[in-house]
Amino acid sequence: MIYGIEAASFHVPSLYLEIKDLAEKRNIEPAKLEKGLGLHKMAFPDVHEDAATFAAEALLKLIRDYNLNPKEISRIYLGTESALDAAKPTATYAMQMVETVLEKDFGARCFKNCDVVDMTFACVG
């Protein structure tokens, strides 16, 4: 058995706001954000997106890009600043969404031997 991180993935929403526009609305000098922090645009979720759908998109991309078998994945770590539920890891929602998409290729409950961990903290997530 091989241990360690085999792959990582992320999802960036397609909607964004130019930092210059944000700075002007907030009465901040645009150069402070553009040159000082290196920011040029800020992505934000569409009405049907949240932390769980971002995670599901990233997980599905990871599985497809690395040709992974979900039945062989034993743990999924999710890093986020935005938990959906104080009792249930956001990664469980993502895993359930991806499991539904992968059911025809890998069978029902293809993640049944996988556990999930959320890391909800701005600097870690």
Regions found by a protein language model. Name each.
Residues 31-50, 83-125:
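Conserved catalytic cysteine-centered active-site region
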